[in-house]
Design a protein with these regions (language model features):
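Flexible hinge/switch segments at interdomain interfaces of large molecular machines
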Residues: 34-44, 189-193, 259-265
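Phosphate-binding chemistry for phosphorylated carbohydrates and sugar-nucleotides
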Residues: 13-16, 21, 25-27, 108-124, ...
Length: 439
C-alpha cells in the first residue's frame, strides 16, 4: 500500500472529523444485525467502530452493557465495576449510555472523580487493588476507548477481575449475548434515564489519578529517577493520561515536562499516519514526527496512545526507538534485577515479535511463552506470576502492577549507566542485545 502525501502532515480543517455529526450519528443510526459489519464484534481488545458507518452506536453500547451485567451475574462477580473513558468524542456519550444500563441493573459503578479521563492502566490498577487478598465480591471494569484509532472511532472494553483484557471465552460470550439483544430490539435491556442513573445509590466516584500516582513508587524507583535528574519529556497525545503526567511530576518531584495538555476531540494537533488518517499511535514514525523533531530537548521522551496502554520512546541519538529493541532491553534488565521473581517465571511475547527476544531469553535462561497478537493473552500469566513480562511490538510492554512502568524504565536505565542504557537509546544493531550485562 502506498504512503499518503498527507503522512506526517497536519490535516487541513476540512479533513478533520465533524464532531456534531459524529455524535448525532451515534444516537440516530441504528445497526442492522443482518449486516456483519454492524454487529457487535470483539477483536483483540473489545468492540470498536464508528458511528458514521453504524459500527459503534448507542444500541451497540446498550447491548454490550447489558451483556456485561448478564455475564457478571452468571460468573458470580458482585464487586464494584470500575468505569473509565478516554478523550475520543464518542467516549462520553457511550459512558452515558452504559451508566443508564449499569445503574438499572443495580451494579455498583465507580466513575472518575470530577469527570476525569481515565487510562486503561488506572482501571486495571483499581481492579487489582480492590481485589487484593479477596476471594469473593471481586471487582472488574470497563474502559470506553478505541485505543489509538482515528477520532471518529469509539470502543468498549471489558476487564475481568484479573485486571487485564478479557479472554476469548468471555468476549465470545458477551459478543453472542449482545448480538442476541440487538436481534430482539433490546427488549431485555434494563435502562433508566441518565439523570436518575447518575444519582443512583449504586453510582459512585473514584479518585483514579491520586490512587494510581501514589502507588507508582511500589513498582518504580522514583527516588533513583529523581536523584539522577533525568530530563524527561512526555506527550499524552491528547489522550486519557493528559492530567496524570503532571500529577506524577508534582508528586515525585522528577524532572518531567508535559509537552501537550490540550484535549481536542478532533486531534487536529496530530500529524497524519501513513495512510493520511489521524491515529494516536506512538509507535508510528509519522504520528510521532513532532516528538522526534524535539528529541534533542530531552534525555529521553515518550508518548502514549489515547487510553495510555501503548507507548513510544524517543531518544536524542536515534529518534523513535524500535519497540522490539526496547522490549528486549527491558526484559534483559528486569530479569537480571528482580531477585524476588520465581526461577521458572517466563517471558511473554507475541508470534510476530522480534527474534531478538528469543535470543535474550536463551542468554538469561528463561522460558518463552509465545501467544497470538493481543495483550489479553498475557493477562492470566501476569496475574498468577507465571509471566514476569508480557510485551508486544505495538509498544505495549507491561507488567502486572502498572503500565506506567515501561515508560519509566528508560529513566531507570539512564540512572544505571553502562551497557543497558547504551542499548536502550542508541538504536544499534539487533545483536547488541546479546552483549548486555547486568549492572
Amino acid at each position: 500500500m502506498s504512503t499518503s502525501p498527507l503522512a506526517g502532515q497536519l490535516l487541513p480543517a476540512d479533513l478533520l472529523v465533524d464532531l456534531p455529526k459524529l455524535i448525532d450519528a451515534y444516537y440516530t443510526n441504528k445497526p442492522d444485525v443482518g449486516i456483519a459489519e454492524q454487529r457487535v464484534s470483539f477483536g483483540t481488545s473489545g468492540h470498536r467502530g464508528s458511528s458514521f458507518n453504524t459500527s459503534f452506536n448507542e444500541n451497540h453500547v446498550l447491548a454490550i452493557s447489558q451483556a456485561i451485567c448478564d455475564y457478571r451475574k452468571q460468573a458470580g462477580i458482585t464487586g464494584p465495576l470500575y468505569v473509565g473513558i478516554d478523550t475520543h468524542a464518542l467516549s462520553e456519550p457511550a459512558q452515558i449510555s452504559a451508566v443508564e444500563v449499569l445503574a438499572a441493573n443495580g451494579i455498583e459503578i465507580m466513575l472518575a472523580k470530577d469527570g476525569e479521563y481515565t487510562p486503561t492502566p488506572a482501571i486495571s490498577h483499581a481492579i487489582l487493588t480492590y481485589n487484593r487478598n479477596r476471594t469473593s465480591g471481586l471487582a472488574d471494569g470497563i474502559v470506553i476507548t478505541p485505543s489509538h484509532n482515528p477520532p471518529d472511532n469509539g470502543g468498549f472494553k471489558y476487564n475481568p477481575p484479573n485486571g487485564g483484557p478479557a479472554d476469548s471465552d468471555i468476549t465470545n460470550w458477551m459478543q453472542a449475548r449482545a448480538n442476541e439483544l440487538l436481534e430482539n430490539n433490546l427488549r431485555d435491556v434494563k435502562r433508566m434515564d441518565y439523570h436518575h442513573a447518575i444519582k443512583s445509590a449504586t453510582t459512585h466516584h473514584h479518585d483514579y489519578v491520586h490512587n494510581y500516582v501514589k502507588d507508582l513508587i511500589n513498582v518504580v524507583d522514583m527516588e533513583a529517577i529523581r536523584g539522577a535528574n533525568v530530563h524527561m519529556g512526555a506527550d499524552p497525545l491528547g489522550g486519557a493520561g493528559v492530567n496524570y503526567w503532571s500529577a506524577i511530576a508534582d508528586h515525585y518531584q522528577v524532572n518531567l515536562k508535559v509537552l501537550n495538555t490540550a484535549v481536542d476531540k478532533t486531534f487536529s494537533f496530530m500529524t497524519a499516519d501513513w495512510d493520511g488518517k489521524i491515529r494516536m499511535d506512538p509507535s508510528s514514525a509519522y504520528t510521532m514526527q513532532g516528538m522526534v523533531e524535539r528529541r534533542n530537548l530531552f534525555d529521553v521522551a515518550f508518548a502514549c496512545d489515547a487510553d495510555h496502554d501503548r507507548h513510544g520512546i524517543v531518544a536524542p541519538s536515534c529518534g523513535l526507538l524500535p519497540p522490539n529493541h526496547y522490549l528486549a532491553v527491558a526484559i534483559e534488565y528486569l530479569f537480571q534485577n528482580r531477585p524476588q521473581w520465581r526461577a521458572n517465571t517466563a517471558i511473554g511475547k507475541t508470534v510476530v515479535s522480534s527474534a531478538m527476544i528469543d535470543k535474550v531469553a536463551r542468554k538469561i535462561g528463561r522460558r518463552l511463552y509465545e501467544v497470538p497478537v493481543g495483550f489479553k493473552w498475557f493477562a492470566p500469566g501476569l496475574f498468577d506470576g507465571s509471566l514476569g513480562f508480557g510485551g508486544e511490538e505495538s509498544a505495549g510492554g507491561q507488567r502486572i502492577k502498572t503500565a506506567s512502568f515501561p515508560r519509566f524504565l528508560p529513566q531507570k536505565l539512564k540512572q544505571k549507566p553502562a551497557a543497558i542504557l547504551a542499548s536502550a537509546i542508541s538504536c544499534l544493531p539487533m545483536n547488541l542485545a546479546m552483549q548486555l550485562k547486568p549492572v
